[in-house]
Amino acid sequence: MTTWGLLFLLWPATTDTQACPRPCTCQSLETMGLKVNCEGQGLTALPVIPAHTRQLLLANNSLRSVPPGAFDHLPQLWDLDVTHNPWHCDCSLTYLRLWLEDHMPEALMHVYCASPDLATRRPLGQLTGYELGSCGWKLPPSWAYPGVWWDVSLVAVAVLGLILLAGLLNTFTESRN
């Protein structure tokens, strides 16, 4: 019976390490999670990361961006190392910046940009929204909204109504006198 009990306890660890992305190595942690080590593998894109990952080591690769939502399926992730990658710090890195701000704010000062020129050799945490770029997002001028014209029309009608009401009151009071 003890053999079956041990097998039952080790089953999650073996299934987690079988889902390990190539060329990374995976190790089960005592905290029922997974350590995924992809350091120095020359990765240019994120591999598919197992859902039970608690530690993810992506340092010393060739990663330039992180797709939006890349870590959203990893609720147990508490240690992420993305240092020493040639990050292209434009709006495509906004997701990584926001994720790090929420989960590991101290790491923002250790993630350095390789490009564009405006951001080269600067920590991701020091960049402003302007420096990250807009990705083509542009707010239309405030007069472009149809709601603004509706508001202006309502104000004009209200003012005209008040003028008419004042005129009627004035006429009514003059006729009584």
UniProtKB/Swiss-Prot annotation:
Positions annotated with a glycan in the UniProt record: N60
Taxonomic placement: Eukaryota, Metazoa, Chordata, Craniata, Vertebrata
Cytoplasmic side: 169-177
Pfam families (alphabetical): LRR_8 (PF13855), LRRNT (PF01462)
Record topological domains on the Extracellular side: 17-147
LRR repeat segments: 60-83
Segments traversing the membrane: 148-168
Domain LRRCT: 85-137
Protein name in UniProt: Platelet glycoprotein IX
Segments forming domain LRRNT: 17-51
Protein role: The GPIb-V-IX complex functions as the vWF receptor and mediates vWF-dependent platelet adhesion to blood vessels. The adhesion of platelets to injured vascular surfaces in the arterial circulation is a critical initiating event in hemostasis. GP-IX may provide for membrane insertion and orientation of GP-Ib.
